[in-house]
Amino acid sequence: AHPEDGESAVVLLAKFICENGLLDADDSEIFRFLWEAFPDFYGSGLKAEYEDEISGRLTAVGSSLQLNDRVARLCIDMRCPITADLQEVEKIVRKVIEGYGWKICSFEGNPGYYRDNDGREVRRLTDICQEVYGRTFVPYCMGGGTYARKLPNAVGYGPGLPFQKKPIPSGHGKGHQPDECVCVENLLYAAEIYVKAILMLDEMLE
């Protein structure tokens, strides 16, 4: 959901190979695409720079590369703003990719999902967090996929707190990082918040 916090091994490898002339001309063209298509994490190399006020900028990263029988296969992970037209995004990206001699074998997209920050339920859920922690929280929209998109009238609601310092080195401890962990204190607060949230939502449904 936040590729800008790291570096793409695929892009670094492609750049090193191209700059040092380690491949013949044909193979070098394959890796030139991998380098030029992802100069940043915001789709500029794919001509897909989308952004909206609610969900921010589109992100795109070549997340995995396979080479089998001289055929290169690249998986591109894109997180689009909720207002973006996925068919339009596919059309633009396809044109750029085919211009490099590649082709799209599969394009799968999930429509964006969003609940208004000012909606009654979201406001009350936020209030409960603030009551338990004694500090201000602001709801936000992100590109990560959650189970919320699979359930009607649901929102992602969990104890991921960026302000908490964990007693481990930088680059460790967060989601999908080495030593991924959560503070025990967070789990206890989360249990209290979830109980209060369930009771609150139950009252709203009555």
Residue ranges and their predicted role:
Residues A1-A84:
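Midchain, well-structured core segments that form catalytic/ion-binding scaffolds
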Residues H2-G6, D26, E108-D116, E180-C183:
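Short histidine-centered catalytic/ligand-binding loop motif
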Residues E4-K15, R57, A84, E88, ...:
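Conserved active-site and cofactor/substrate-binding residues in soluble primary-metabolism enzymes
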Residues D5-A9, V93, G171-G173:
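Short intrinsically disordered coil segments
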Residues L12-L23, I92-Y100, R120, R124-V132, ...:
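Generic non-transmembrane alpha-helical segments
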Residues L67, A72-G144:
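Substrate-recognition/cap regions that form aromatic- and gly/pro-loop-enriched pockets
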Residues N68, D127-I128, R135-M204:
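Zn-dependent metallopeptidase/amidohydrolase metal-coordination segment
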